[in-house]
């Protein structure tokens, strides 16, 4: 049986490399900013643990403080030796359960020109299995195109009019203005007249 537990700075030091292996360096948060976020409570580092063996099988980094009541699933990584065994699916179920009292869960899927073409499509299908829907956005992370998907829980998936504020609010809690300008570029979605 799997469970989820909140981790701290020691685990971040040990497992930050796992995120670096799974995510493009251009979308990585500086480790110091993540330490700051863990300290001020604006993020949680979560471990998915096998109760029987007490082994950590997956990690997630989630921005939890927001004026709007949503959380941001920033990273989810499964340990390399236990991939393709349903751990990602179980991890998502546990994350959904942990944040069931929130308005919803937001996920960002980035794409850079040199990425494998089907990579983001595969991640979209994976998230859609858990009720995530695509939100229209004008968003880039580290210069790469970012697709936003939202799992509505108590709130709405219709965040397009304020999505640029929601995303900026998450990052402003642990990134300096300089780091935000370098990493996050999100603008209000312009509606075309029909």
Predicted region positions:
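Conserved catalytic-core motifs of GNAT/GCN5-like acyltransferases
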Residues: 108, 124, 128-147
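Conserved acetyl-CoA-binding loop-helix of GNAT-fold acetyltransferases
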Residues: 78, 84-98
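Conserved GNAT acetyl-CoA-binding A-motif
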Residues: 99-118
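Short amphipathic alpha-helix that is part of the acyltransferase structural core
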Residues: 1-33, 49, 161-169, 173, ...
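Short, charged/polar, Gly/Pro-enriched secondary-structure boundary elements
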Residues: 154-159
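C-terminal lobe and adjacent flexible extensions of AdoMet/dcAdoMet transferase-like proteins
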Residues: 191-194
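A conserved beta-strand-loop-helix scaffold within acyl/acetyltransferase catalytic domains
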Residues: 23-77
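Conserved N-terminal glycine/acidic-rich loop preference
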Residues: 67, 112-132
């Amino acid at each position: 049986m799997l469970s989820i537990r909140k981790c701290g700075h020691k685990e971040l030091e040990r497992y930050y490399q796992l995120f670096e292996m799974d995510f493009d360096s251009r979308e990585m948060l500086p480790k110091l900013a993540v330490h700051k976020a863990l300290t001020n409570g604006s993020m949680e580092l979560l471990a998915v643990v096998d109760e029987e063996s007490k082994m950590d099988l997956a990690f997630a980094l989630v921005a939890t403080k927001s004026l709007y009541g949503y959380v941001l699933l920033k990273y989810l990584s499964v340990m390399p030796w236990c991939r393709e065994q349903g751990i990602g699916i179980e991890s998502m179920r546990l994350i959904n359960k942990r944040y069931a009292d929130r308005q919803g869960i937001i996920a960002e899927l980035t794409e850079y020109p040199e990425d494998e073409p089907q990579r983001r499509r595969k991640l979209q299908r994976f998230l859609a299995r858990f009720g995530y829907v695509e939100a229209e956005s004008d968003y880039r992370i580290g210069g790469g195109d970012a697709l936003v998907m939202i799992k509505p829980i108590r709130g709405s998936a219709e965040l397009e009019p304020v999505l640029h504020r929601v995303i900026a609010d998450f990052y402003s809690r642990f990134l300096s203005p300089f780091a935000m300008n370098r990493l996050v570029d999100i603008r209000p979605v312009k509606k075309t007249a029909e």
